[in-house]
Amino acid sequence: MTNTRKTHPLIKIINHSFIDLPAPSNISAWWNFGSLLGLCLTIQILTGLFLAMHYTSDTMTAFSSVTHICRDVNYGWLIRYMHANGASMFFICLFLHVGRGLYYGSYTYFETWNIGVILLFATMATAFMGYVLPWGQMSFWGATVITNLLSAIPYIGTTLVEWIWGGFSVDKATLTRFFAFHFILPFIIAALVXVHLLFLHETGSNNPSGLVSDSDKIPFHPYYTIKDALGILLLIMALMTLVLFSPDLLGDPDNYTPANPLSTPPHIKPEWYFLFAYAILRSIPNKLGGVLALVFSILILTLFPLLHLSKQRSMMFRPLSQCIFWILVADLFTLTWIGGQPVEYPFIIIGQLASILYFSIILLILPTASLIENKLLKW
């Protein structure tokens, strides 16, 4: 008798994706972040669903409804903080997942990589709109500042901003539409994840050596299901430690003050996971230039397959590229730090230098290092 999981039209798909999937035998813990991102998305959708049952997207009651969730709803505080800190965990996993892709040359899977970049953009948009919903000071002013960036677009900018706002300032219409988009986008992300996996399973996973591993494959279950289970356990432990011991660690105290259009906070800054891009935006004195740099700082990821000049796929055996890669990581930490600092000396110049270094490494230094390494191979 044939096995149901191999013949049933629906179960067969799951079987080919998570059970009998041939996987390289040498993939390290860096390959755990895909499943962890799936877990984060699931947590965010579930906690978000329960929050949406009690939240009201009206400027008069939004802040009070969040307070009501935390004070009066059974375990509302837990759901709210799991959702807020779950977003931080989501971005930690995202950055590590992208970093792994850059280090081991996974971007050579062109379609998978580009859908991944679209997923990153969609997640950033979702997180931004979610930050506006509690309608605290930083929510309101963050929404005002970031949406206002679109006014830098020539000719249609101002009209576009007012169209997004639904009026002449960030108000009730803006909050309502942000809530609607914040609710629907995670489901669009989930659909894109399936397409991301579809393209990945066309080629199979990359591995640390960057070599073709067709001759040495093992079944996904039980080897990688148990490995993913360990990663999931560690992620949940980290998330719950953050939620139960220091839930406001990564938040902004200003967001505990209800939104007031007449009082601007001294330092407007986004959540920590956007600070690197915010620093790049602020480092350019021109508004349109800053917006273009901001968009390009993420969009530049799509250029990696074109800028890959090395004869080897992975950085595993390329010490020069490894060194430059870690300088890039340090530069991103520097940008994140600068994004949270006030706009004054010496932070302005540090931010500008870090921004120049960021684009230089990706567009110039890494490809040059690859060519040098190619030459060294011939010696």
UniProtKB/Swiss-Prot annotation:
Disulfide bonds: none annotated. InterPro entries: Cyt_b/b6_C, Cyt_b/b6_C_sf, Cyt_b/b6_N, Cytb/b6-like_sf, Cytochrome_b, Cytochrome_b_C_euk/bac, Cytochrome_b_N_euk/bac, Di-haem_cyt_TM. GO terms for molecular function: metal ion binding; ubiquinol-cytochrome-c reductase activity. Keywords: Electron transport, Heme, Iron, Membrane, Metal-binding, Mitochondrion, Mitochondrion inner membrane, Respiratory chain, Transmembrane, Transmembrane helix, Transport, Ubiquinone. Its cofactor is heme b. PROSITE patterns: CYTB_CTER, CYTB_NTER. Heme b b562 binds at residues 83, 182. It is found in: Mitochondrion inner membrane. Coiled coil: none annotated. GO terms for biological process: mitochondrial electron transport, ubiquinol to cytochrome c. The chain crosses the membrane at residues 33-53, 77-98, 113-133, 178-198, 226-246, 288-308, 320-340, 347-367. One of its GO terms (cellular component) is respiratory chain complex III. The cytochrome bc1 complex contains 11 subunits: 3 respiratory subunits (MT-CYB, CYC1 and UQCRFS1), 2 core proteins (UQCRC1 and UQCRC2) and 6 low-molecular weight proteins (UQCRH/QCR6, UQCRB/QCR7, UQCRQ/QCR8, UQCR10/QCR9, UQCR11/QCR10 and a cleavage product of UQCRFS1). This cytochrome bc1 complex then forms a dimer. Heme 1 (or BL or b562) is low-potential and absorbs at about 562 nm, and heme 2 (or BH or b566) is high-potential and absorbs at about 566 nm. Component of the ubiquinol-cytochrome c reductase complex (complex III or cytochrome b-c1 complex) that is part of the mitochondrial respiratory chain. The b-c1 complex mediates electron transfer from ubiquinol to cytochrome c. Contributes to the generation of a proton gradient across the mitochondrial membrane that is then used for ATP synthesis. PANTHER family: CYTOCHROME B (PTHR19271:SF16). This is Cytochrome b. It comes from Xerospermophilus mohavensis (Mohave ground squirrel).
